[in-house]
Amino acid sequence: MNLALRFSYFGDRFSGSQMQPGLRTVEGEFIEACRRIQVFDDWREARFATAGRTDRGVHARRQVCSFLTDLPERAIQVLNRVLPGDIWCTGWAEPPEGFHPRYSARSRTYRYYFFPAPEKIAAMNDAAQVFIGRHDFSSFARSSGRDPERRILAARVFLEGRFAVFEVTAESFLWNMVRRMATVLEAVGSGESDAAEIERLLAEPTEQRVAAAPPWGLILWDIDYGMTFNPIQIDVKSGRYLASRLRYHAVMACAADRLAPDDRAV
């Protein structure tokens, strides 16, 4: 059967998600785990594919892959035990015939987290609305010969604790597009730019692209296929890994705060 799996990962210890010889990647680890439990031998024959690639340092909450296997139950029940701690499956589905995780997606949603939250959240949210609709995003991405036009379905900026969150949904995105959009919105939040600048960049595309925000704030948040995924229990190993990362970064944040000079900006 063709099995679709939804999974999550921390991106900071991977050289991106796409398989690359000699480098640790999400796809490489996932395929190796599938081979170890013998749900398939050759990823090409199994037609292994993911919904899309993420760059080095970018995280995913709901990435999706699919592959052909005669042992779907083994994949569902065992895969989390053999995957490394920074990748874990969260759901499975038997998709309809002709399903492809990349081309069957109705929409994709990303979130970019800003810390500390800029002061002008309302202005950022208003500016984010300018992105909605179909536009030429040449100023916000490297199209690499692809059509630079994309249709943004929804965009908003809101507070979540001490963070500002930029959430954007589209049918598809160009390379580094969300991170460059985040850069401009952060400038709006600090008062260095405004919605009119975004309107200009969309109306008058330029080869001098906006710089990309750092990858660690970006999460592939969700992908909509119009189908329901059945839950998969997270493995104890990944649960411990998540708890360990939370403790580590909480302590590091405290240390950075205590070690910073008194005239620090944060």
Model-derived features: where do they sit?
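Structured-RNA-binding interfaces characteristic of tRNA pseudouridine synthases
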Residues: 1-266
